[in-house]
A protein has these predicted regions:
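Sec-dependent N-terminal signal peptides of Gram-positive bacterial secreted proteins and lipoproteins
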Residues: 2-22
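Lectin-like carbohydrate-binding module/patch detector with strong preference for beta-trefoil
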Residues: 24-177
Length: 177
């Protein structure tokens, strides 16, 4: 009987290990890190808080070459309760501010005071697969809009836009540090 239990436990462990990491929509991110860099699939530029110091309310989000500054890091360690795959994207240079969407197509992405606002602050990470499991679409599901870069130059605005099936809406998550 002891051998049978051991065999069943072993088979169950093997079966669980063979399930793909992203098999279920409700799983959390594959990599459990608290600080990430987010670069655009189209041009490798990083999400960037457009400031030379610490972000404040209303700081615009742009894309920029890697400068190594904390304004290009995001903290996503806090998942949104009851909303699988949703995270608050706080800026590492000042964690009092989070990425916010106000719901209009073409709205400039900004940082606003982090309030745990369930409508305008959660960002959903949608695995897009591709050649890497770290490629995601970032969406505000309340308004069905995707995080979109508008160009491949330093300071290119990042907007919330409807899905366009282009790689300017795909983002690569990387460990920072």
């Amino acid at each position: 009987m002891k051998k049978l239990i051991t065999l069943v436990a072993s088979l169950l462990a093997v079966a669980l290990l063979t399930v793909p990491v992203f098999a279920a929509e409700n799983q959390s991110l594959a990599v459990d890190i608290t600080k990430i860099s987010i670069s655009n699939e189209a041009n490798n530029d990083l999400l960037n808080a457009a400031t030379e110091s610490s972000p404040v309310n209303g700081t615009r989000i742009t894309t920029w070459d890697n400068t190594g500054h904390a304004t290009q890091r995001r903290d996503y360690s806090e998942s949104v309760p009851g909303k699988p795959q949703h995270y608050w994207l706080k800026n590492s240079a000042n964690r009092s501010y989070a990425v916010t969407c106000y719901g209009t197509d073409g709205q400039q992405v900004t940082l606003q005071s982090f309030t745990r606002n369930m409508t305008t602050q959660p960002v959903k990470f949608i695995n897009e697969g591709g050649s890497s499991f770290n490629i995601y679409g970032l969406a505000n599901t309340t308004y069905i809009l995707a995080l979109t870069t508008t160009g491949s130059y330093n300071g290119a605005p990042v907007l919330w836009k409807g899905s366009n099936n282009q790689n300017n809406q795909l983002w690569v998550l990387g460990a920072w540090g």
